[in-house]
Amino acid sequence: MNNYIFVLSSLFLVGCLGLALKPSPIYGGLGLIVSGFVGCLMVLGFGGSFLGLMVFLIYLGGMLVVFGYTTAMATEEYPETWGSNWLILGFLVLGVIMEVFLICVLNYYDEVGVINLDGLGDWLMYEVDDVGVMLEGGIGVAAMYSCATWMMVVAGWSLFAGIFIIIEITRD
């Protein structure tokens, strides 16, 4: 299981590299979609089925809208690719090589570990007398509204501000 999450983390970083080294806006949106999808798989790998599904539906649904919008606004007859400029391709390959080197070093020194989340016991197990029941659907809702409240507020306001930034940029 750790190797699965480790490979997904590496793919997430490669997607972020693709986002940072985008030669055209089309590939930036594609990098965000790939990174978001891999992030959802990581959440599912840790057992957060509801939260992974919510992120997949809401975040990637919104990203597909933004991806379609940027594609429509920045359509080029011959868009640049990662291979059309040797400098961009070199940085992308260098980033992937550095990521593989980091994976090898971490595996050699056995530094890969799972994060210990101590405060999760309050809402994971529902105990009555000596019997404990875990409700899977409610775990995601509890996580979203108890531990991740400020992240949701910041994400909502960021999306709200992003709409106005996009409107201001595309205004004639």
Curated annotation (Swiss-Prot):
<keyword id="KW-0249">Electron transport</keyword>
<dbReference type="GO" id="GO:0042220">
    <property type="term" value="P:response to cocaine"/>
</dbReference>
<keyword id="KW-0813">Transport</keyword>
<dbReference type="InterPro" id="IPR050269">
    <property type="entry name" value="ComplexI_Subunit6"/>
</dbReference>
<comment type="similarity">
    <text>Belongs to the complex I subunit 6 family.</text>
</comment>
<feature type="transmembrane region" description="Helical">
    <location>
        <begin position="86"/>
        <end position="106"/>
    </location>
</feature>
<comment type="subunit">
    <text>Core subunit of respiratory chain NADH dehydrogenase (Complex I) which is composed of 45 different subunits.</text>
</comment>
<keyword id="KW-0520">NAD</keyword>
<keyword id="KW-0496">Mitochondrion</keyword>
<dbReference type="GO" id="GO:0042542">
    <property type="term" value="P:response to hydrogen peroxide"/>
</dbReference>
<feature type="transmembrane region" description="Helical">
    <location>
        <begin position="1"/>
        <end position="21"/>
    </location>
</feature>
<dbReference type="InterPro" id="IPR001457">
    <property type="entry name" value="NADH_UbQ/plastoQ_OxRdtase_su6"/>
</dbReference>
<keyword id="KW-0999">Mitochondrion inner membrane</keyword>
<keyword id="KW-0472">Membrane</keyword>
<dbReference type="GO" id="GO:0032981">
    <property type="term" value="P:mitochondrial respiratory chain complex I assembly"/>
</dbReference>
<keyword id="KW-1278">Translocase</keyword>
<protein>
    <recommendedName>
        <fullName>NADH-ubiquinone oxidoreductase chain 6</fullName>
        <ecNumber>7.1.1.2</ecNumber>
    </recommendedName>
</protein>
<dbReference type="GO" id="GO:0008137">
    <property type="term" value="F:NADH dehydrogenase (ubiquinone) activity"/>
</dbReference>
<dbReference type="GO" id="GO:0006120">
    <property type="term" value="P:mitochondrial electron transport, NADH to ubiquinone"/>
</dbReference>
<keyword id="KW-0830">Ubiquinone</keyword>
<dbReference type="GO" id="GO:0005743">
    <property type="term" value="C:mitochondrial inner membrane"/>
</dbReference>
<keyword id="KW-0812">Transmembrane</keyword>
<dbReference type="GO" id="GO:0035094">
    <property type="term" value="P:response to nicotine"/>
</dbReference>
<keyword id="KW-1133">Transmembrane helix</keyword>
<dbReference type="GO" id="GO:0042776">
    <property type="term" value="P:proton motive force-driven mitochondrial ATP synthesis"/>
</dbReference>
<dbReference type="GO" id="GO:0009060">
    <property type="term" value="P:aerobic respiration"/>
</dbReference>
<dbReference type="GO" id="GO:0005739">
    <property type="term" value="C:mitochondrion"/>
</dbReference>
<feature type="transmembrane region" description="Helical">
    <location>
        <begin position="38"/>
        <end position="58"/>
    </location>
</feature>
<keyword id="KW-0679">Respiratory chain</keyword>
<dbReference type="Pfam" id="PF00499">
    <property type="entry name" value="Oxidored_q3"/>
</dbReference>
<dbReference type="InterPro" id="IPR042106">
    <property type="entry name" value="Nuo/plastoQ_OxRdtase_6_NuoJ"/>
</dbReference>
<dbReference type="GO" id="GO:0045271">
    <property type="term" value="C:respiratory chain complex I"/>
</dbReference>
<feature type="transmembrane region" description="Helical">
    <location>
        <begin position="147"/>
        <end position="167"/>
    </location>
</feature>
<comment type="function">
    <text>Core subunit of the mitochondrial membrane respiratory chain NADH dehydrogenase (Complex I) which catalyzes electron transfer from NADH through the respiratory chain, using ubiquinone as an electron acceptor. Essential for the catalytic activity and assembly of complex I.</text>
</comment>
